[in-house]
Amino acid sequence: MNAQPPVIIVFGAAVRADGRPSTAMRLRVEAAARFGTALEDRGEAPLYMPTGGVGRFGASEASVMAGLLRRLGVPAERIILEETATDTLASARACARLLRARGHAGRVYAASSAYHLLRCLVLLRMAGLDAHICPPPRLPASTSFRRRWYWRLRELVALPVDTGLMLWLRLTQRQPPGARGPDARA
């Protein structure tokens, strides 16, 4: 067993106007909880880091996901909220910053929708984390052929844009790789 517990980083999705999670968010959280249970069965008690700030409606994505995790049986003390990020790149950077501040240098797992996982993984690794993927939700968030392809094609643009931005941030020392201490910026 590792000295540090693995951390499952759950990437946010929309919160509905009534404060309920979108289907994509619910499926991501359920997949993360299922994977966390599998880790527990292997003797590892993971921490969960839902990430996502306030979108168009009241509550932060992270707080809504934390509520879902608690309803799925995850103890509150194993949940670390990251409530500032407004997109995937900001989530990767903010989670890396939070984990460094906690002295965490162990494994992290990205939990998201299948179409989104590659970008999450690449950005977390570029942020200096030992990142892996959590098995994605078993069902797509949308059954519409057009919607599913929209999200996949969106990733074709978002992946090179976000990796280019992360590379620029690292090259300009706005995020030193493996940075430690109070001066570490992510």
Predicted regions and their residues:
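Active-site cores that bind ATP or allylic diphosphates and position pyrophosphate for catalysis
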Residues: 178-186
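A transmembrane-helix-recognition feature enriched in membrane-embedded lipid enzymes
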Residues: 145-175
